[in-house]
Regions:
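Pyridoxal 5′-phosphate
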Residues: 1-421
């Protein structure tokens, strides 16, 4: 394969891409040469939809013109604004609308879920986590374990890849669940791992955990909006995710949370951290002293939500609804496959792609452990308008996302690499 072949293929793929028009609905940053950057970093911070500014401005104007009356008299009243998101989020994570809610931020939601779902006993207090769990999740978990009087070093079991492999196979996680079933209270895994890009089988892990009465919860920061999900049917107990990566809600955007209906609608509501926005909507403003949770995920809300952050998120969710997850996933597999083909074909000695090769076991990110001049290659990419990221000690992450990336972006990435070598 040559670079010229790759360019020809990319031109054709871009010409035949039925989602190509969606790129115009995003603001693509410009490189110093005036051309669009090749933005391969949607796994870190998604780009701004062109409609986001207007959507936020509408709320600013409402605030200016209505003041407090915006809560009830605005055409999209703020008191119920977050409800606009349930249908979209339910589609994206495969849930019923009442099983999802947009609230807080990811780590806060993880704490809220651990408070309700990590119920250690003397015998069963351990938590199984994946090998490259995001540090914030480990900090949250360790602090929750300590708060319940256990020792995190003893209580956290880490599922590691078997010697020859860099990725964690679902069957190995299931084997660990079987092995430690009598001491596990919770399994907490990433849907897609932030470092390796590996995707785990949520249904299989949940099923194995439930066979032994263990709760199964998931961090979907890198899965939501990236891979198809069916949390309700897979029976997950809870999940949390952020909206600033694949869901393009902007930096620090309000996050998402899923609670399966069997918990959200249980006759005996789960213990939780409570706040007035989770209180029954009909009596919330009676300001009574006793907390009565809204059935479903909304019952875990604490505060009235950050309106401008929600407003910035809405246009992206509408784009997801317009494109449909099936079409996005098909393009995502094609883009990632093309990137892998280009890297393996043109730079076989550059490094090792540590993300699994099977499309079903990954999303749109490829993590490459670069064996030669890793930092130099990364610096060259960014200096030449290929925006990607670096994870210590030697991993470059490239993520072509189907909403706004073109096959031509991958060619640009490869062109820079071929000059940097
Ligand atoms: C997998 C994963 N979990 C948790 C977090 C923490 O998110 P937040 O800072 O929004 O709480 C991140 C942030 O990038 C992440 O990638």
């Amino acid at each position: 394969m040559t670079l010229a072949d790759l360019r020809t293929q990319a031109d054709e793929l871009d010409r035949n891409d039925s989602l190509a028009h969606l790129r115009d609905r995003f603001c693509i940053p410009r490189h110093t040469d005036g051309a669009d950057v090749a933005y391969l970093c949607g796994n870190s911070l998604g780009l701004a939809p062109t409609a986001a500014r207007e959507c936020v401005e509408q709320e600013l104007v409402a605030w200016e013109q209505l003041g407090v009356e915006g809560h009830f008299k605005h055409e999209r009243p703020w008191v119920s604004f977050h409800e606009l998101f349930a249908k979209h989020l339910a589609e994206i994570v495969g849930a019923k609308p009442y099983e999802v809610v947009a609230m807080n931020t990811l780590t806060v939601n993880l704490h809220l879920m651990l408070t309700s779902f990590y119920r250690p006993t003397h015998e069963r207090f351990k938590v199984l986590v994946g090998h490259a769990a995001f540090p914030s999740d480990r900090y949250a978990l360790a602090s929750q374990i300590e708060l319940r009087g256990h020792n995190p070093e003893e209580a956290i079991l880490t599922a590691k890849p078997l010697a020859a492999s860099r990725v964690l196979r679902t069957e190995d996680v299931v084997a660990l669940i079987e092995q430690h079933a009598s001491e596990l209270a919770l399994v907490l895994m990433d849907g897609v791992n932030y470092y390796t890009g590996e995707r785990i089988d949520i249904a299989a892990i949940t099923e194995a955990a439930h066979r032994h009465g263990i709760v199964a919860g998931f961090d979907l920061a890198h899965a939501a909006g990236n891979v198809p999900l069916a949390l309700h049917d897979w029976n997950a107990d809870f999940a949390v995710w952020c909206h600033y990566k694949y869901l393009n809600g902007g930096p620090g955007c309000v996050a998402g949370c899923f609670v399966h209906e069997r918990h959200g609608f249980a006759r005996e509501p789960r213990a939780r951290m409570a706040g007035w926005w989770g209180h029954d909507k009909h009596s919330r403003f009676k300001m009574g002293p006793d907390f009565e949770p809204i059935p479903g995920a909304e019952g875990w809300q604490l505060s009235n939500p950050p309106l401008f952050s929600l407003a910035a998120l809405l246009p992206s969710l509408e784009l997801f609804a317009e494109a449909g997850m099936d079409r996005l996933r098909a393009k995502s597999e094609a883009l990632t496959g093309f990137l892998e083909l280009a890297i393996r074909g043109l730079f076989p000695e550059w490094g090792e792609v540590i993300t699994p090769a099977e499309p079903a076991r990954r999303g749109c990110q490829l993590s490459i452990r670069v064996t030669r001049d890793a930092k130099r290659a990364f610096v060259a990419l960014v200096a030449n308008g290929v925006i990607c990221d670096w994870r210590e000690p030697d991993v470059i992450r490239l993520a072509p996302v189907p909403l706004y990336n073109r096959f031509a972006d991958i060619v640009r990435c490869v062109e820079v690499l071929s000059c940097a070598k």
